[in-house]
């Protein structure tokens, strides 16, 4: 079988890895043999993840790969799509009590990889610990039928017809930049934080079900506490999912896009609730509304999907789209929703997501997930240095929100080889 990839695949170059890493910390040491069995069984349920990239004419397609998905007994990074990875665009690993998943955004984005992760963890936990306390109703098991909606290409052939749409918001041409001396530029560093969900959301907008706007305000206030002369807007690129606008709620491609959200220098004197409300108005667009559909249309319009477009034209179009969507912001924040652990969190202590590349080397990146009763936050930057992390934690403390720094880590991400 062949599948259409995320169109950002055409933007791939040495500065745009478009891969991510998940680290799941279990409550006991990981059995590599049992994990390998769990991965092998789980992948039979997800043929659209068992793929290798292939050039067909002037397009890239994902072709079913019969070779096994690697499960390493360490934390190694490999080149996704390479022989070391059996040509696959994802791989697993484990070390001590941690499980690692490296995957390409070209096969999934948003929570598209979430069902696979839960299947693997369920099969592993069932063998190692038994099934007590686990709910299988929302876990795909290997013998379950595969719905067409899971792997169908979610992008329409033509833009939606929209009435009464507001103009798409454009990020300011100049955004507040981070202090280059805040990091030592010695590789990618992550700082792991835990925040109780109830404690934080009690301080946020009561109608805001997402932590994104509140965390963005806390980050904004941290910048202001460090720099009394901010004259440019602080701009976040915020991950937003248009699943409902596309009517593909279970699709592996949830159509993750980035919308600019910003606060002007004058906002530094606003009350936190006012800041949160203003930012929330920019971030939470709602579902199936004209503005959401218009944002979808922007992506469709950017796609070089004309039949006569050659590979070079597709690459140029997508690189332009990536540059306009990602570069030039102050920080990025991503939250794909509350994790439905189905009882698996009795065996999971922590989970963190990692991203980062040269196109974002002057930005802070925040990945927000949930486990148990906590938000788990990964703050990532291009080098070691706690200037912004400490300032962020201080702002939470001023709001009487408990926050725990779990640790810091120098990390690496997988590169990807493509037949371009």
Q: What are these model-predicted stretches?
A:
Residues 21, 102, 181-183, 204:
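A short, mixed-charge helix-start or loop-turn motif at secondary-structure junctions
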Residues 2-5, 107, 111-115, 119-202, ...:
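Non-catalytic, low-complexity flexible loops and terminal extensions
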Residues 61-62, 90, 124, 220:
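Tryptophan-centered motif/residue detector
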Residues 27-46, 102-118, 189-231, 377-379, ...:
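Acyl activation and transfer enzymes in specialized metabolism, enriched
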Residues 61-63, 140-141:
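Conserved catalytic core of two-metal-ion nucleotidyltransferases
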Residues 1-59, 67-91, 224-420:
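Acyl-thioester-dependent acyl-group transfer interface
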Residues 94-96, 206-209, 232, 327:
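Short, well-ordered loop/turn elements at secondary-structure boundaries
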Residues 84-130, 135-146, 369-388:
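Histidine-centered acyl-transfer/condensation active-site motif
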């Amino acid at each position: 079988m062949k599948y259409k990839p995320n169109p950002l695949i055409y933007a791939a170059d040495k500065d745009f890895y478009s891969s991510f890493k998940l680290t799941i910390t279990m409550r006991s040491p990981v059995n590599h043999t049992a994990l390998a069995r769990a991965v092998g069984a789980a992948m039979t349920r997800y043929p659209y993840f068992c793929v290798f990239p292939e050039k067909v004419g002037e397009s890239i397609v994902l072709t079913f790969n019969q070779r096994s998905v690697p499960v390493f007994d360490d934390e190694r990074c490999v080149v996704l799509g390479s022989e070391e990875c059996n040509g696959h665009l994802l791989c697993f690993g484990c070390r001590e009590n941690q499980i690692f998943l490296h995957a390409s955004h070209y096969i999934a984005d948003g929570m598209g990889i979430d069902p696979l992760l839960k299947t693997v963890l369920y099969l592993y936990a069932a063998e190692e610990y038994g099934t007590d306390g686990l709910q299988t109703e929302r876990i795909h098991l290997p013998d379950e039928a595969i719905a067409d909606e899971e792997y169908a290409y979610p992008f329409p052939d033509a833009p939606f017809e929209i009435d009464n749409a507001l103009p798409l918001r454009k990020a300011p041409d100049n955004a507040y930049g981070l202090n280059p001396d805040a990091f030592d530029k010695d590789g990618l560093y992550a700082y792991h934080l835990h925040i109780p969900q109830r404690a934080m959301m009690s301080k946020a907008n009561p109608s805001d079900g997402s932590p994104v706007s509140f965390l963005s305000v806390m980050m904004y206030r941290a910048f202001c506490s460090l720099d009394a002369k901010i004259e440019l807007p602080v701009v976040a690129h915020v991950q937003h999912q248009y699943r409902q606008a596309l009517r593909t709620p279970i699709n592996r491609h949830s159509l993750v896009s980035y919308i600019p959200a910003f606060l002007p220098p004058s906002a530094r004197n606003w009350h936190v609730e006012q800041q949160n409300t203003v930012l929330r108005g920019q971030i939470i667009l709602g579902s199936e509304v004209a503005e959401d559909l218009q944002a979808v249309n922007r992506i469709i319009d950017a796609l070089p999907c004309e039949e006569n477009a050659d590979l070079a034209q597709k690459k140029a179009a997508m690189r332009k789209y990536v540059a306009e969507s990602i570069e030039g912001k102050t920080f990025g924040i991503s939250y794909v929703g509350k994790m439905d652990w189905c009882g698996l969190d009795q065996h999971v202590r922590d989970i963190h997501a990692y991203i980062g590349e040269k196109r974002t080397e002057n930005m802070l990146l925040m990945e927000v997930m949930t486990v148990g009763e906590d938000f788990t936050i990964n703050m990532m930057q291009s080098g070691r240095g706690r200037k912004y992390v400490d300032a962020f934690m201080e702002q939470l403390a001023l709001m009487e929100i408990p926050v725990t720094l779990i640790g810091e880590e120098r990390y690496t991400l997988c590169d990807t080889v493509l037949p371009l």
